[in-house]
Amino acid sequence: MTLPSRSALFKLGCRVCHELPPVERVQVEDHAAELRRNDALFARWAAGYGVIRHDPLTQVRVDAMLRRADEHAQGLDRSGWLGQLIAADRVASAGLWLVAHMTYAREVRRDGRALPAEAFKPMPEGHTGGSLNMVPAYVGYLVANSLSGMTRGWIMGQGHCVAAIDALNLWVGNLHPAHAGRYDLSDAGLSRFVADFYSYAIRSDGTPASPLGSHVNAHTVGGVSEGGYLGFAELLWPHMPLHGERLVAFLSDGAFEEQRGSDWAPRWWRATDCGLAVPIMILNGRRIEQRSNIEQAGGERWLHRHLRLNGFEPIGLDGRDPASFAWGILEIETRQQAQVGSDHPSAESARLGYGIAEAPKGFGFPGAGGNRAHNLPLEGNPASDTAAREAFNTAAQHLWVAPAELDAALAALTTHASQGRARERDHAMATRNVALPRLPVPDWKKVGTSSSPMAALDEYVLQVVRENPQLRPRTGNPDELRSNKFDRTLDALKHRVTFPEHGVAEARDGAVITALNEEAVICAALGNKGGINLAVTYEAFGVKMLGALRQEIIVARHLTEAGRPPGWLSVPVLLTSHTWENAKNEQSHQDPTLVEALLGEMADTSSVGFPVDANSALAMLRACYASHGRIVALVVPKREVVTRLTGEQSACLAVNGAAVVHGDPRAAQALLVAIGAYQLEQALQAADRLDEHQMRTAVICLGEPARLRQPRDAHEAPFTLDDTALSALFPTTVPWCSCSMRAAPWWQSSCCRSAC
């Protein structure tokens, strides 16, 4: 038997046999036919199931994978692997079947009987096409885990495709308590499951009645990102797995055009300090209303050229076939493992594998490949349209798997106990629990001296990083560290680059992720949840980070509400060269939008601080690193300012959000409230003038305004001052005047209780 050359397996990253050059195509087809003739079990798998077919190229690739089985088998031989691949086809078909029901049906019949009109939803909803495309992808991920005996993490950029994840996790029993207590595999349990999807029902307290969401949520097993903001998963994934961990990133071709920076991963990923990370784009060629830009520019072949220019090795996958996904995951990992111990960035072998899984949008159901596939692929509503109902029932019959056959397939893929590995719900990136770092006592500045708060933070960040070598550091930097007084951190951690420039603070293993793209660099910090992180930017440019930050805030809050609070170290975002320091660059560089938006979020997950000197900045940063699961924005002066607070006062300010820096509020005739360093200086000058005129004043430094608000729920309450603490600062009989960094008219009313 003559085996196809390796070039035939990878030629131009072909996904199916007909894309190969003629000679190699014949070679692969002949070899696949011989494999089927000589191995009955292989032939049974190769025959496919329902709408799932295995192209000859996939067959040959899978055979090559099986020949390496001894390296990965974890107790399985060739027949065991083939048995799992056969099972995967049945599970994928059942997944397609259930996803279609989630969109259209409110009743499920496991015996496969046709549904009558009353069994359908009067108002179907579902992002169906993308969800159908994700079914073979996620099954391929499950099979790769089972075949290799290793549980990988996953992230999905197209969060609206969550129906695929939830449906398959229900089939395989990979559930969190909210799903396990509500759904099962009976007709009644499955009917409740599909009826809950897009039900919009709410409880008396205003929370959703259904744990199913339109996007990845806290109950989506293994979910780490909502995926509602297209493009951020594409920026997060290379920074997510720690060395020794594994991740599969399912990416969107629509997000590829949405977000700059998704093709920069080869600049950041290194075999030396990153875990194995497999990016796979679901290339279905369509946005909501038209073809994607990739499709318009030339499709898969254009994308291959683009990716190679950016340091990737494109590998074509059949997006209709779970076996192709499983092979792609294991193949890309094998190529990455070959880089361990090697440092030859110019070598072809250093390219980062990138799977391109092409399939018609909505594969497996009527309407595939057209605009309708995005949401509701049928031409009518089966609840009221006979033709649409017949189309649904006919398509569902092709996807249906007999219960006994499906149960056997599900059992074949449930190998966690025998392999001693975690369930997919418990993968490393979904269960981060980072121990609080060692935080040295800061070098407190002497009251009355002048210093740059940013320079003080620079010194302290470096101390913390050196005290905690077990934590991988990442600093997100839109090319401003030196101008923002972070020289020491940059010199020690260095820009991460492919080819370092002599005499510049650059290194291949640098920990500073620098790009003139705020979304890309903030995602470096947000993705590194197993490490310690920081982002530094001009305040005005921070608003470009808002979408990514808000996604993290939402997910963290929902996890807390679900009883699984996030265990990653809180992430500080230093906003400097701020509104009161950047007048030289006109109003475009004086933009307080980010902090105004973050102040609207819940204070337990989103903190906005206004340090007034070096000591208060140090205390707030230290408090940030001593907490979990929060985004902490600090508006920090970079110019020298007078140190007003002692270390002890600063620590109290970081905890309470407010501190008295002059006078006694209970004895005062007027209170001056300052938010910000420059505002405090003016408030103190005003207090001196008023004192000279025999008007007793007290000056209160408000370091975290949200501490003064009326808590909006029980989770936020511990992060706000109680009435006793509030009245000690703001006696109700004393008038007060605020000197704020913000001119927005809603500032005081949104941050402070009316009792103030």
Could you tell me what each predicted segment is?
Residues 256-268, 549-557, 618:
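Acidic/histidine-rich catalytic neighborhood of metal-dependent amide-processing enzymes
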Residues 119-135, 154-161, 207-226, 252-255, ...:
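Active-site nucleophile and cofactor-binding loops and adjacent substrate-binding regions
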Residues 172-176, 475, 680:
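Alpha-helical support elements that line or immediately flank enzyme active sites
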Residues 85-90, 100-109, 154, 410-568, ...:
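Non-catalytic terminal/interface segments that mediate subunit docking, oligomerization
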Residues 193-211, 217, 222-226, 240-248, ...:
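Thiamine diphosphate
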Residues 84-114, 119-272, 487-489, 519-528, ...:
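Cofactor-binding active-site loop characterized by glycine-rich and histidine/acidic residues
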Residues 2-172, 453-458, 462, 477:
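N-terminal amphipathic, basic-rich helices that act as targeting or association modules
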Residues 175-190, 269-280, 309, 503-506, ...:
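A glycine-rich helix N-cap at a beta->alpha junction
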